[in-house]
Amino acid sequence: MRVIVLGAGLLGVTSAYYLQQQGHEVTVIDRQATPGAETSFANGGQISVSHAEPWANPSAPLKVLQWLGQEDAPLLFRLRADMRQWLWGLSFLRNCTPERTRHNIRQIVSLGTYSRSALQQLRRDTGIQYDQRTQGILHFYTDPKEFDGALGPAEQMRQLGCERQVISADEAVRIEPALRHIRPQLAGATYTAEDESGDANLFVRELAKLCERAGVRFQMGAHITALRTAGGEIDHVELTNAEGRFERMRGDAYVLAMGSFSPLLAQPLGIRLPIYPAKGYSVTLPVKDARLAHQVSLTDDEYKLVFSRYTSAQGDRLRIAGTAELNGYDRNLNQVRCEAIVRRVEQLFPGAGD
């Protein structure tokens, strides 16, 4: 069967890998020049089953209201005359009940556990390297109320098989000595030894190389403009290729893996995908003093930031990512939000990054 994968990010390339392994003829199409150049480019790099509590939870509505208008808020809604944003927002609110939150935690833990297991098997099968670390993920809290609020979800995750252990501030510093600078502010922490971290962009690029060697075709620099139907089925993809020429491509099956842009292609087909773009921010810093930089991947729950450390032949670097801005497809960077991330890094690990 000929399969066309739309999108060369982490999900698109991974789908292409497994489809090729099953014997299909696979073509991947993406508008960027290289795989993994958008959502997968510089994210937080955590493989975090322990991060299973959804944004939509009982405490979220009040927090969102408090954060409205705060440029450096962890979650910033910029209200727009955009029906898709309002529909997504209403769905978000419907999922903030205790019952929905418990259900969604169950679903996320199940999916996350399966995904982590699949990644580990893929690593064994291919030997792929992507600056991965298997030292777990530590969630730390500097607000006692935030810490108390995390205990219930952590217990539910343990009951579901995710070993997210509640630990003291002293135990947190023992696991990650770089937190000693903020020991007086630590209210507590949780630690999941089975969780991992790694460079998502490097993973995608390395897996794409394996796919190409196995016969997967990549058509990069191609702008997908529409999915056309005939007889109630997708008949072909319309695109403008890297040379600016119009093309039609036909397959027996199609994988839509374009992240927040997927709804724009699906909507003309009468398919409404409940997906809305969230703009995240990240900073990557070379490690200046290895003794001051963290080793374990961290989550700062109060500021909604994650921290990963990557080690390669070119040296160590810190990836700090997080916060979310819901502002449609706007790609402009807000300097206030960028500075807030850098400021938090300096508070937690002064002198660690350059």
Where are these regions (language model features)?
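Predominantly flavin-linked oxidoreductase catalytic cores and closely associated redox partners
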Residues: 151, 155-184, 191-277
